[in-house]
């Protein structure tokens, strides 16, 4: 082939190459087995991370719900002492409402002062508890539960839950009095500590009452004491009268008997022949 023809062909092929740009064909690279395994591990770790995050969120919500439920239950649950205090407060309010019509002005002031003092003490106890209170002066709340089985302390009876110990009307108070008096006074004369018991019992019963009411009770006790003294004096006088009559009759009988053992008596001369 002539040299010129070769040059023409080269020039034409060069021009054609310049006119048509080369298209890059992407050939997918084949992955190796270890690369595919790494990719699957990464996906599994992502899924596990998402699952653990969901589990943590669920556990957190469950813990919050449980804590909230426990807090509500604790707030709603009342202790035995709280129930007793509420019971006493309701009974006290009922008593005050019943006695409000009969009380005098001084009694009303005394009741209001006592109620305010008790409220202040309760508020201070809620704020400070037992801080600053010596152990010897700590006042223990009286328990109204009574054990019915000495061998089992858990078997108790709550007296404040019984209707008879929660009187509100005059009739209910009379029923409680009639139920308590036979129990307290049964065989009282044979109990050596009964007098001390009654002194302290009456004092504690009247401790929260107004002074005017205590004076009325004291007057009735004084009248009862005077009546008992009269009865005791009358009984003692009857015994003395019986003893005196018995002694007089014995002396009179002895005076009419001649004493044959006495030789000091002198007889008149007229007694002889």
From Swiss-Prot:
From the record, give the transmembrane residue ranges: none
| Compartments it resides in | Cytoplasm
Gene Ontology BP terms: formation of cytoplasmic translation initiation complex
Compositionally biased tracts (Basic and acidic residues): 55-75, 105-126
Q: What is its main location?
A: cytoplasm
What InterPro entries does the entry give?
A: eIF3-like_dom_sf, eIF3j
> Organism's domain of life?
Eukaryota
GO CC terms? eukaryotic 43S preinitiation complex; eukaryotic 48S preinitiation complex; eukaryotic translation initiation factor 3 complex
Instruction: List the coiled-coil residues.
Output: 50-97
- In residue numbers, the region (Disordered) covers 1-158
Q: Where is the composition biased (Acidic residues)?
A: 34-54, 95-104
UniProt keywords (A-Z) are: Coiled coil, Cytoplasm, Initiation factor, Protein biosynthesis
Query: What's the stated role of this polypeptide?
Result: Component of the eukaryotic translation initiation factor 3 (eIF-3) complex, which is involved in protein synthesis of a specialized repertoire of mRNAs and, together with other initiation factors, stimulates binding of mRNA and methionyl-tRNAi to the 40S ribosome. The eIF-3 complex specifically targets and initiates translation of a subset of mRNAs involved in cell proliferation.
The record ties this protein, via HAMAP family, to: eIF3j
Q: Which family does the entry's similarity section mention?
A: Belongs to the eIF-3 subunit J family.
Q: What does the subunit comment say?
A: Component of the eukaryotic translation initiation factor 3 (eIF-3) complex.
Protein name, per record: Eukaryotic translation initiation factor 3 subunit J
Give the originating organism. Answer: Pyricularia oryzae (strain 70-15 / ATCC MYA-4617 / FGSC 8958)
């Amino acid at each position: 082939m002539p040299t010129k023809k070769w040059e023409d062909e080269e020039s034409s092929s060069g021009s054609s190459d310049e006119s048509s740009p080369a298209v890059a064909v992407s050939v997918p690279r084949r992955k190796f087995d270890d690369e595919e395994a790494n990719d699957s591990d990464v996906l599994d770790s992502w899924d596990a991370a998402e699952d653990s995050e969901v589990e943590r969120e669920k556990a957190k919500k469950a813990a919050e719900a449980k804590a909230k439920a426990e807090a509500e239950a604790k707030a709603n649950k009342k202790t035995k002492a709280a129930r007793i205090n509420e019971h006493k407060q309701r009974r006290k309010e009922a008593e005050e409402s019943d006695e409000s019509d009969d009380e005098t002005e001084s009694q009303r002031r005394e009741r209001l002062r006592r109620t305010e003092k008790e409220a202040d003490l309760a508020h201070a106890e809620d704020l400070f508890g037992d801080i600053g209170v010596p152990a010897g002066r700590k006042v223990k709340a009286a328990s109204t539960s009574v054990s019915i089985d000495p061998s089992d302390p858990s078997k108790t009876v709550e007296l404040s839950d019984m209707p008879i110990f929660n009187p509100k009307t005059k009739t209910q108070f009379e029923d409680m009095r009639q139920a308590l008096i036979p129990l307290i006074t049964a065989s009282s004369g044979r109990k050596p500590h009964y007098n001390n018991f009654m002194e302290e019992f009456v004092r504690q019963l009247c401790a929260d009452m107004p002074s005017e009411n205590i004076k009325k009770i004291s007057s009735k006790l004084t009248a009862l004491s005077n009546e008992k003294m009269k009865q005791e004096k009358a009984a003692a006088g009857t015994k003395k009268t019986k003893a005196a009559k018995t002694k007089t009759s014995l002396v009179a009988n002895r005076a009419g008997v001649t004493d044959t053992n006495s030789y000091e008596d002198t007889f008149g001369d007229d007694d002889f022949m």
